[in-house]
Amino acid sequence: LKDGLLDTGDIGYLDDEDYLYITGREKFVIVNKGGKNIYPEEIEEHLKTSNLVKDSVVFSSDDKNIIVIIQPEELVFKNRHLDEVKKIIYDCVLDTNKQLESYKRINKVYITTNDFKKTSTQKIKRDFLRDFKSTDYILAN
């Protein structure tokens, strides 16, 4: 307990009608060079609206580049060469970027064919990002 409240690490807000909205987790927040907060979960939710994206992880290794690793849906690979897959996923990210404020836009896109490891509640385990090596993934842009 902290100040009489349970500290879960969740970040959110109450709207005018006192509805609670969870926007992210405190430990995942990216603070860019301009001091603006970027919530990876918000960007991931935008990407999930595409039927091309099975899963994604958004992060920053240097607080100026917003990076995404995308696991495309299997249909994206069907009867396509890798260059076509890369273009399809990159175009999907460009569409997502149009919906985001400029400081939240993704500027590096990687593709993986592997499933992300998940918790028992089906959230992606982000601990692998500490050892992120771009050579382990397919660059899409």
Residue map of PLM features:
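Active-site metal-binding loops of divalent metal-dependent hydrolases
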Residues: 4, 10-11
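Conserved C-terminal "lid"/linker of ANL adenylate-forming enzymes
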Residues: 30, 94-141
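A structural signal for the hydrophobic beta-strands that form the central parallel beta-sheet
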Residues: 7-8, 22, 111
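AMP-binding/adenylate-forming catalytic core of the ANL superfamily
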Residues: 11-102
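Alpha-helix boundary recognition
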Residues: 1-2, 48, 130
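Flexible, active-site-adjacent loop/turn segments at secondary-structure boundaries
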Residues: 3-4, 28, 36, 114
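Adenylate-forming AMP-binding core of the ANL superfamily, especially NRPS adenylation
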Residues: 1-3, 16-17
